[in-house]
């Protein structure tokens, strides 16, 4: 067995401490997941309903509200912006904007974004994870991002920043089988000549429960979560191993070099500074006092990856922000935010209880109880059998008295209106309304009023979107930092726009157009940009309303036909514009010939 690394023991101890600290949040979040999946009742509640001959199927208003909220927030992909800090860098802003869109496309950004919003809504916390895929592009690598299940991430419980910037560290746990690890790291299949074992066989396995918590409610629906299927495979190679990626902050030296003659300033890391010190010309300038050198300490993120008792690898990421970007929902100034499901669970339980009472009353009304005087019927069981036969003749002794049917009291109209009121409160808390779901009865009579109401109805969703856009902006900054260090070779970025136009830029290619781009990737002082997200870019828009506005502007002469045509759903916009140009040219030629 390989000897344990001291650093690994420290990381495992932190994992245990931070996991224990979030145990209460984990239980509540798992209960939220159960509610989303339709498992609203505990085992005792389900058994009680079955004893009453009532179904344990809830009237699940919460699910539809969550799905509608997700549809509104993720209607369209976000639009990134890159604002240069200096006027000289303005020509490269579109390059960075294209790179961010390119990374979004190759990372399946639309699907990933929707899953993050799902976790954000259900558990209260979603995660983006930016990384470099070393195998992509035939080994040249690509900067990508994905989503992370919130149960796989543990955070320093002392963090108070919304994006956990003040946390001493973050940990990402992944449970692999033996075969999965060998696929990812073939080096682990190498045989130790001393004992004849593969390296992976000398690594400690993982014998604890999955990082995904177990349910607390009865599984009334056919939902198969990771805690359910974790033991389905018992064959060869199914042994479990825990891989922990530990992200921590360290200080890295950088050097700010100023040329006192020209006023130019550059910033170099230690490796480039050592190369610069070997330059004789630079040494002469430094000896003459013409160069000012200042060492500064900058925060960078260190990644330490452990497997069992060994350190698999570790390196420093050229970013001052954690590559794991949280998307907290109802912020509580801790790493344990609340979710929309948790905020509305009591309303859903109330709705289930009201429906149970209504169902119980319906059962009592449809199956009337029969009260018989004692001794008037000889065989009660025979009476119960004959009672179900509409043509049966039943004998009884009237001297004991007449049979009696006690009728239940009718339900009040206020009770019957309770479900609608509860559904309204759930929609109100989620910031969605029936009109936004296509309910014609809740819509105004005119189209203009409907569009205005739809716009007003999205204000709650837009408020929550502001918080989500903050996390998207943070993700863009991390991608910017990783891409700036990674894309140091010649590469072409192509992105197809929604109007079928193609944006194409080549980096690290020296010609009149993009010679400065290569300098941007090699020099940290050139090309500093502030990455942002265009507000409301992911929200749905009313295309009929937009088209009417553009048509009015076109008819008023405020815009040309090209701008108006780009807002339509016509597929071949470029072809239409080309044919219109040809027609106009022919008309001009005909007019000139007639003159």
Question: How should each PLM-predicted stretch be described?
Answer:
Residues 1-595:
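Extended alpha-helical, oligomerization-prone segments that build pores/tubes and scaffolds
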